[in-house]
Amino acid sequence: MITISDAAQAHFVKLLADQPEGTHIRVFVISPGTSQAECGVSYCPPDAVESDDIEIEFTGFNAMVDEKSAPFLEDATIDFVTDQLGSQLTLKAPNAKMRKVSGDAPLVERIEYVIQSEINPQLAGHGGNIMLVEITKEGVAVLQFGGGCNGCSQVDITLKDGIEKQLLDMFPGELTGVRDVTDHQHGEHSYA
């Protein structure tokens, strides 16, 4: 469920050494399955452990995950990174905003999952997003751009060199292309 790097495990052991005995960590998601989902890590004293918590054992400590957060922490990774600017704990949870779908789910659900978990987080850096409008009988994913992508001068490059390439690589034989149906209006909201 959650992978914690050796560096992050050592960091947690060091932090927990200053806490009351029996304290572990809690990994959680606030507003799981929504676009506002946020992940966090906190101390979990023994009296804060709930009967339905999932307990994951590591060397020197355990991680507690509440039942509601668990499916949204699938494939999550925690690392402790040191660079020239210092050290920081990173938590990446690709399924926090949308529950992972199975490989045999309908094509529309699998594409929606990729859009929400991989493509939209990249576009969010420019204040943009896309949504799947439909998949045609010919296997074309019809997309609509929003936010900073609407009216952006780079939208064709983003669509063909980025999104289309990624989706065709992920769904060979199921998708034949992508098409943008956005009525692009360049304005102050547009990224470029």
UniProtKB/Swiss-Prot annotation:
This protein's UniProt keywords: 4Fe-4S, Iron, Iron-sulfur, Metal-binding
InterPro entries xrefs: Fe/S_biogenesis_protein_NfuA (IPR017726), FeS_biogenesis (IPR000361), FSCA_dom_sf (IPR034904), HesB-like_dom_sf (IPR035903), NIF_FeS_clus_asmbl_NifU_C (IPR001075)
GO MF annotations in UniProt: 4 iron, 4 sulfur cluster binding; iron ion binding
Chain residues that bind [4Fe-4S] cluster: 149, 152
Key word Coiled coil present: no
Highest taxon above the source species: Bacteria
Function, as annotated: Involved in iron-sulfur cluster biogenesis. Binds a 4Fe-4S cluster, can transfer this cluster to apoproteins, and thereby intervenes in the maturation of Fe/S proteins. Could also act as a scaffold/chaperone for damaged Fe/S proteins.
Family as reported in the entry's similarity comment: Belongs to the NfuA family.
Subunit (UniProt): Homodimer.
Protein name in UniProt: Fe/S biogenesis protein NfuA
Organism expressing this protein natively: Shewanella baltica (strain OS155 / ATCC BAA-1091)
Source species taxonomy: Bacteria, Pseudomonadati, Pseudomonadota, Gammaproteobacteria, Alteromonadales
